[in-house]
């Protein structure tokens, strides 16, 4: 902002705080507008397998991603059964880091995810994060415990069980394509396995003062697995 304020005068520069799509017709031509949004590196599955270290995942990157939540009713946020999101993948002309701080975007690709696809995506991320934390050469115990705590929560309206109730419960599955329901079930199987493995890793690392905390998480895990088994009609 300072760069362009110095160039055009601060009274002529306006920041757009919303990272959504901007209609040029809504803008006043006498102002220079700057829109800033947070992006994260974007990798395909194959790339993730090749880029194993933190260094490899933060260097020589030219594709970035940001997501915008929306609902068909026009609201930004809604319940899990109505929450959609638009994913935008940006490809820059050069890889970061670069000799310049700003690099033009060569092209952008948009994908809209419907509610069950959002659930599949969010649960797949949880599985990948747990697996990555457990496979690190030096396990970050604080990060692992935070991730576990959020994963084995059995709250009614939050966490993984909210997705299971919304999309895998008998009264709801018929509303969604069979292939998406099957995929979400498979992701949940992987999720339960990843949580169990993460609990085992955590148990090996903790000291005596955290034994009670570990037992509490294990109890939550068993309760979550039990409820998932009832929803999915199979032992997970």
Which residues does each predicted region cover?
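Eukaryotic intrinsically disordered, low-complexity segments enriched for acidic and Ser/Thr/Pro residues
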Residues: 2-236
């Amino acid at each position: 902002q300072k760069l362009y304020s110095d160039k055009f005068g601060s009274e002529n520069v306006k920041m757009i705080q919303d990272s959504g799509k901007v209609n040029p017709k809504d803008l006043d031509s006498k102002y220079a507008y700057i829109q800033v949004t947070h992006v994260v590196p974007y990798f395909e599955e194959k790339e993730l397998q090749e880029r194993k270290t933190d260094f490899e995942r933060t260097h020589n990157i030219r594709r970035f991603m940001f997501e915008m939540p929306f609902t068909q009713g026009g609201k930004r946020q809604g319940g899990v059964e109505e929450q959609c999101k638009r994913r935008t993948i940006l490809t820059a002309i050069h890889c970061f880091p670069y000799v310049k701080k700003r690099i033009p975007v060569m092209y952008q690709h948009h994908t809209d995810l419907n509610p069950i696809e959002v659930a599949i995506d969010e649960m797949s991320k949880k599985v990948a994060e747990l697996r990555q934390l457990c496979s690190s050469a030096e396990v970050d115990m604080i990060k692992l415990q935070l991730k576990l705590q959020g994963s084995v929560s059995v709250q009614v309206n939050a966490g993984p069980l909210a997705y299971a109730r919304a999309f895998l419960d008998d009264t709801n599955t018929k509303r969604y394509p069979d292939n998406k329901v099957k995929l979400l079930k498979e992701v949940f199987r992987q999720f339960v396995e990843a949580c169990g493995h993460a609990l085992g890793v955590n148990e090996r690392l903790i000291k005596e003062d955290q034994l009670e905390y570990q037992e509490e998480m294990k109890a939550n895990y068993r309760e979550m697995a039990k409820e998932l088994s009832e929803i999915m009609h199979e032992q997970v």
